[in-house]
Amino acid sequence: MSTIKSGDIDKGSFLLFKGMPHIVLEREFSKMGRGGSIVRLKLKNLKNKSVIKETLKGSDTVEEIEVLEVNSQYLYKDNESLIFMDLETYDQFSVNLRDVVNLEDKVLFLQEAEVYSLIKWGNEVIDLKLPPKVAFEVIDAEIAVKGDTVTNAMKNVTLHTGLVVKAPLFINIGDKILVNSETKEYAERVKV
């Protein structure tokens, strides 16, 4: 672990704050007149998922935790765990859904046999990185009604992982679409 000045903290940094690992969700830097600078942080506790707001002076220091990014292949979901394979050792390991922040939200984006980046702190997985856009096959789509195109009309489509998103009327069953993994919104149709 190393200490860094609060002015050097970036969004997405991993910090040890009050003895617990946190990720920086938001960061705002303010330069005061003669009083120096302050940094406002929004932190998410990686253990209990609580979100706190902290204000630090620009000269304050905090502990930055050393994390390791490991590429692992997603194999399958087993009750409350996700099973991955380490690509270097070929060992299989499980990650409990309740142990990782926002993992429940990311499960519907995981596809078997795909490789994902897991963020580890020591031997513990603390985060999972998704690509910005993920390709899915549409398995169910509402029927588009002719004449619904006065505005930017959208309909619900169900993807092969169970995720339901709004998509344009021209999307049909069997189409492949890209979905933004951060906003869970339709991005574009995959060209064949």
From Swiss-Prot:
One Pfam match: EFP
Top-level taxonomic group: Bacteria
Coiled-coil annotated residue ranges, if any: none
This protein's UniProt keywords: Cytoplasm, Elongation factor, Protein biosynthesis
Function text: Involved in peptide bond synthesis. Stimulates efficient translation and peptide-bond synthesis on native or reconstituted 70S ribosomes in vitro. Probably functions indirectly by altering the affinity of the ribosome for aminoacyl-tRNA, thus increasing their reactivity as acceptors for peptidyl transferase.
Pathway(s) served: Protein biosynthesis; polypeptide chain elongation
Name listed for the protein in its UniProt record: Elongation factor P
Gene name of the encoded protein: efp
Species, as recorded: Borrelia duttonii (strain Ly)
A cellular component term, taken from the record's GO annotations: cytoplasm
